[in-house]
């Protein structure tokens, strides 16, 4: 595995990848109803994508109140510190925003 890169994502521009990951993890694996997975917070949240070799493998979001949520890593990349990389990036951004 190459090093995982985490970047801030754009909800509009990166929507397909963000949705693909969350649908795989929350809707398909965890049986979260779609109407509960997608909410109005998505449009306003700061989203993050974890990428390995340029391929999106994980996501998370940061709400305006500082709440971290929707942390998801695709099954094949679990146990490889992708979640750690996401959380470090989200926390750093939350601290930067105050």
Language model: regions and residue ranges:
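Short loop/turn motifs at secondary-structure junctions and domain boundaries
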Residues: 38-43
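Short amphipathic alpha-helix that is part of the acyltransferase structural core
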Residues: 1-37, 55
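Conserved acetyl-CoA-binding loop-helix of GNAT-fold acetyltransferases
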Residues: 79-92
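A short, internal acetyl-CoA/4′-phosphopantetheine-binding micro-motif in the GNAT/acyltransferase core
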Residues: 71-78, 94
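Conserved beta-strand in the GNAT
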Residues: 49, 54-72
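Conserved GNAT acetyl-CoA-binding A-motif
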Residues: 92-98
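Short, basic and Ser/Thr-rich N-terminal targeting/leader segments
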Residues: 44, 55-56, 98
């Amino acid at each position: 595995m190459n090093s995982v890169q985490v970047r801030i994502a754009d909800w509009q521009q990166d929507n397909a990848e963000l949705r693909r990951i969350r649908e795989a993890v929350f809707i398909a694996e965890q049986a979260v109803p779609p109407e509960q997975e997608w909410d109005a917070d998505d449009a306003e949240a700061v989203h993050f994508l974890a990428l390995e070799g340029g391929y999106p493998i994980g996501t998370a979001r940061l709400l305006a109140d500082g709440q971290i949520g929707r942390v998801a890593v695709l099954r094949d990349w679990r146990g490889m510190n992708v979640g750690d990389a996401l959380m470090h990036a989200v926390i750093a951004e939350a601290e930067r925003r105050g």
